[in-house]
């Protein structure tokens, strides 16, 4: 991945600023002509003379973006662009303000309106306190790093989070009746930029000066590999170059690949006969619409000939199971709980979308840079040919991860996913140990029906084991929701709440 970098934050005088990341790794564009390009779509919006650009809103780049096709527009963080058209939804047609009027499509979530609050690299908007703490506690953020976010409890107010020597401190940014903002009543400001500028110069009751906008661990996902992907995501295998085999399983292999000579991807190749192409495409069309920071994004498929290719985003460290068992996975309890919270976050989104994973396990969770974890392979278990599954595994389901009502009666629900999540918690806290050690699949089913549950592993906090037991309740309706599980894990270590300077000074 790219090296850690920093930039000056907004100073309220109209200078363009934008969000920073330390994950700037994207392979540079290369020999596009040697690789078959996507089928051309209708021409971009009509050319507009630069003299008329004054009609169009100006946006600023929040992250670097390297073009993936000839239709794209490359830009750097801080570059200014005219937005000519937003008709394509997640991909906007833009003209560069600074590079001889070059035009092309850009991902809309990589830019923000010039001089707006969203364009400030220290403004993160709607994120939780626990997310702010995790971001600021990353090793590349120094003491004095800060961010401002929307208040979780009071609409219209904000929260200021600052990295101190020993912890992250949180301050309420409140409003007076006249609309002015304050942290302490002795210092009031008309806009957030003024507040930030003031606390850059002096602490005035804060734990330290505001020195560095918070760096982010990764760029946001784009909506697919390219703008046409929303409608046309069946791609030719000639566009994919398989570089390195990452692993193999009972249904195929996983490769690191390069799409279109520009973009790193993961490619799952499925053994012939693993599933019906028609059923897979039907399920994949749903999977592709599921987008969340803690879900692996499905980019494209190749189904015209076997083996089927499933093209997704690439995660550096592979499966959580192998990560936990390897040298890189020697994690502290705080990190293990954070991994569990991330998985619960992705599953909470699937829960909201009324979507069932069916095969939740550490082997189907992937790990990237800076401890980022994402749920993978959601929905694939539904379209795997059951006879092939049974021939390879000796059972229709991975019994030790499967809820009893699903294993015995094929009743898969989000609550059966919750049961599986409890087993994932066991895998996490034991660094990838196989569940129900020493027991066969039939023995596991029999023991579970007799109310047996795995005991608390060594060095596992009782509170963590209690969450497992909640996931393994016999009555599916009595199991917690993933929303509840996410909250429980995010708040597992209750840090100090808001620090109110008015009460201290």
UniProtKB/Swiss-Prot annotation:
Provide the catalytic activity annotation: L-tyrosyl-[protein] + ATP = O-phospho-L-tyrosyl-[protein] + ADP + H(+)
Q: What are the residue boundaries of the SH3 domain, all occurrences included?
A: 54-116
Q: Where is the composition biased (Polar residues)?
A: 1-10, 18-31
Give its E.C. classification number: 2.7.10.2
Q: Which InterPro entries match?
A: Kinase-like_dom_sf (IPR011009), Non-receptor_tyrosine_kinases (IPR050198), Prot_kinase_dom (IPR000719), Protein_kinase_ATP_BS (IPR017441), Ser-Thr/Tyr_kinase_cat_dom (IPR001245), SH2 (IPR000980), SH2_dom_sf (IPR036860), SH3-like_dom_sf (IPR036028)
SMART domains (alphabetical): SH2, SH3, TyrKc
> Where in the sequence is the active site?
359 (proton acceptor)
Residue stretches making up the Protein kinase domain: 240-493
Main localisation: cytoplasm
Q: What top-level branch of life does the organism fall under?
A: Eukaryota
Q: Provide this UniProt record's keywords sorted from A to Z.
A: ATP-binding, Cytoplasm, Kinase, Nucleotide-binding, Phosphoprotein, SH2 domain, SH3 domain, Transferase, Tyrosine-protein kinase
**UniProt-listed SUPFAM superfamilies:** Protein kinase-like (PK-like) (SSF56112), SH2 domain (SSF55550), SH3-domain (SSF50044)
Question: Where does the protein end up?
Answer: Cytoplasm
Q: Which residues bind ATP?
A: 246-254, 268
Extract one GO cellular component term from the record: cytoplasm
Residue span of region Disordered: 1-53
Please list the residue ranges annotated as the SH2 domain.
122-214
- A GO MF term: ATP binding
- PANTHER family registered for this protein in UniProt: TYROSINE-PROTEIN KINASE
The entry assigns this protein to a family as follows:
Belongs to the protein kinase superfamily. Tyr protein kinase family. SRC subfamily.
The name under which this protein is listed is Tyrosine-protein kinase isoform SRK1
Organism annotation: Spongilla lacustris
Q: What is the lineage of its organism?
A: Eukaryota, Metazoa, Porifera, Demospongiae, Heteroscleromorpha
């Amino acid at each position: 991945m790219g090296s850690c970098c920093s930039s000056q934050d907004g100073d309220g005088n109209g200078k363009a600023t934008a969000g920073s990341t330390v994950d700037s790794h994207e392979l540079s564009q290369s020999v596009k002509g040697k690789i078959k390009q996507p089928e051309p779509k209708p021409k971009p919006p009509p050319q507009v003379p630069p003299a008329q650009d004054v009609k169009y809103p100006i946006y600023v780049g929040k992250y670097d973006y390297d073009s993936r096709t000839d239709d794209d527009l490359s830009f750097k963080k801080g570059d200014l662009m005219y937005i000519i058209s937003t008709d394509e939804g997640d991909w906007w047609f833009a003209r560069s303000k600074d590079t001889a009027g070059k035009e092309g499509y850009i991902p809309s979530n990589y830019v923000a309106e010039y001089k707006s609050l969203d364009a400030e690299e220290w403004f993160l908007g709607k994120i939780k306190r626990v997310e702010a703490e995790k971001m600021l506690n990353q090793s590349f953020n120094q003491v004095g790093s800060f961010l401002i976010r929307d208040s979780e409890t009071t609409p219209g107010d904000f929260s200021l989070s600052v990295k101190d020597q020993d912890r992250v401190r949180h301050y309420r940014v409140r409003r007076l009746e006249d609309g002015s903002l304050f942290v302490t009543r002795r210092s009031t400001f008309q806009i957030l930029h003024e507040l930030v500028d003031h606390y850059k110069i002096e602490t005035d009751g804060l734990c330290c000066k505001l020195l560095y906008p918070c760096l982010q661990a990764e760029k946001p996902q784009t909506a697919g590999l390219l703008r046409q992907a929303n409608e046309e995501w069946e791609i030719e295998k000639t566009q994919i170059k398989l570089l390195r085999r990452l692993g193999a399983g009972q249904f195929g292999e996983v490769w690191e690949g390069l799409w279109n000579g520009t973009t790193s991807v993961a490619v799952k190749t499925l053994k012939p006969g693993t599933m019906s192409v028609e059923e897979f495409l039907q399920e994949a069309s749903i999977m592709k619409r599921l987008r969340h920071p803690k879900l692996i994004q499905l980019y494209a498929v190749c189904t015209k000939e076997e083996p089927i290719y499933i093209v997704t985003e690439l995660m550096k460290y592979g499966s959580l199971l192998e990560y936990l068992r390897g040298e890189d996975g020697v994690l502290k309890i705080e990190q293990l709980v954070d991994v569990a919270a991330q998985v619960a976050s992705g599953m909470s989104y699937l829960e909201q979308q009324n979507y069932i994973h069916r095969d939740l396990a550490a082997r189907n969770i992937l790990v990237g840079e800076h401890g980022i974890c994402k749920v993978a392979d959601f929905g694939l278990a539904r379209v795997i040919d059951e006879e092939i599954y049974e021939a390879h595994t000796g059972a229709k389901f991975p019994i030790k991860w499967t809820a009893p009502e699903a294993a015995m009666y094929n009743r898969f629900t989000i609550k059966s996913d919750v049961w599986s999540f409890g087993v994932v918690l066991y895998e996490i806290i034991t660094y990838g140990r196989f569940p129900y050690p020493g027991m066969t699949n039939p023995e596991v089913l029999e023991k579970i029906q007799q109310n047996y549950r795995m005991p608390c592993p060594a060095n596992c906090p009782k509170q963590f084991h209690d969450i497992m037991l909640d996931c393994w309740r016999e009555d599916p309706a009595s199991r917690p929701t993933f929303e509840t599980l996410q909250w429980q894990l995010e708040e597992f270590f209750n840090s100090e709440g808001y620090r109110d300077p008015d009460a201290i000074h």
